[in-house]
From Swiss-Prot:
HAMAP family cross-referenced by the UniProt entry: ATP_synth_b_bprime (MF_01398)
Keywords in alphabetical order: ATP synthesis, CF(0), Cyanelle, Hydrogen ion transport, Ion transport, Membrane, Plastid, Thylakoid, Transmembrane, Transmembrane helix, Transport
Major subcellular location class: plastid
Location within or outside the cell: Plastid, Cyanelle thylakoid membrane
Name this polypeptide is given: ATP synthase subunit b, cyanelle
Lineage: Eukaryota, Glaucocystophyceae, Cyanophoraceae, Cyanophora
InterPro entries per record: AH/BAR_dom_sf (IPR027267), ATP_synth_b/b'su_bac/chlpt (IPR002146)
Function description: F(1)F(0) ATP synthase produces ATP from ADP in the presence of a proton or sodium gradient. F-type ATPases consist of two structural domains, F(1) containing the extramembraneous catalytic core and F(0) containing the membrane proton channel, linked together by a central stalk and a peripheral stalk. During catalysis, ATP synthesis in the catalytic domain of F(1) is coupled via a rotary mechanism of the central stalk subunits to proton translocation.
Amino acid sequence: MNLINSTKIFSSLMIASVENNTAIFSLNTDILETNLINLLVIFFLLIYQGRPFFTALLEERRKTVLDKIKKSENSYNEALEKLKEAKSKLAQAELAAKQIYEEAEAVAESIKKTGLAQLEKDIKRIEETTQASINTQQLSVITYLRQQVALLALRRVVSQLKNYLKPELHSQFIDRKILQLRKQK
């Protein structure tokens, strides 16, 4: 409704004339026709009576804008604090990650060294065990061979003695020994 009244007022103040396909606007200076007095009364009432209303409205709007600005500033400051805290936590996390990585590398290197040292010990132990096993086997084989050589030598001696001690030689040997014993008495 305000829009309709304002267009009526505007149209009453301005007169449009169209001549030769061109629009020309001009100001209507007839006071009675334009309701200038009515307009002045309305403007006076708006300014005089509406001033406290518009002042209060503008003051409330100003307070709302200031409150929103303060809230925005507070939010901005809180966001800056949170960003600062997040950066601090990020730096701490990066430092912790770096320390964990360094510790992991140290542990891996230690395990590697320990593993290599243990591997060398195991290889040395296996070599020693193998050498001891070989030595034991050699002694066992040497002992077996000595026994076999001794057994073979005894068999040869027995065989040779059997050849030398035939019953006739055996009787002669016994007789000689008996004679030697008699002589000694």
